[in-house]
Amino acid sequence: MSLVIPDKFQHILRIMNTNIDGKRKVMFAMTAIKGVGRRYSNIVLKKADIDLDKRAGECTEEEVEKIVTIMSNPRQYKIPDWFLNRQKDIVDGKYSQLTSSNLDSKLREDLERLKKIRAHRGMRHYWGLRVRGQHTKTTGRRGRTVGVSKKK
């Protein structure tokens, strides 16, 4: 960061209902938004023609609006389908990039659907057990510890 802070420097930006630190570089500052990682923020900034070495607080209003529009409509800006975090949605078959509260609600809906159709994954979630095939004989124990009484 340069020693002189520009006149229109914002220390905290508000993008997609998330506070973003203006002192960090734009690419890394955008990762504070849930559902946005370094790779996705990198490709969005390249599509928006924004310098990656720029600090987030130095972005103008137009640049912020451009970032938001690209993030909300990634397919219109030629971001490939395999890059998105919601591919072939089970309900409508669309490809999209979910962020912040939309991501939380979609994940919750997916789990509710799995529980409702009584799929194996849904039942494991319901029982509070490991879902992805891990061993559970010794690890993942919660609750009260059961002691062993000593023989007299």
Curated annotation (Swiss-Prot):
Residues 133-152 are annotated as: Disordered. Keywords: Cytoplasm, Ribonucleoprotein, Ribosomal protein, RNA-binding, rRNA-binding. The keyword RNA-binding applies. InterPro entries: Rbsml_uS13_C (IPR027437), Ribosomal_uS13 (IPR001892), Ribosomal_uS13-like_H2TH (IPR010979), Ribosomal_uS13_CS (IPR018269). Located at the top of the head of the 40S subunit, it contacts several helices of the 18S rRNA. NCBIfam families: PRK04053.1. This is Small ribosomal subunit protein uS13. It comes from Spodoptera frugiperda (Fall armyworm). The lineage of its organism: Eukaryota, Metazoa, Ecdysozoa, Arthropoda, Hexapoda.
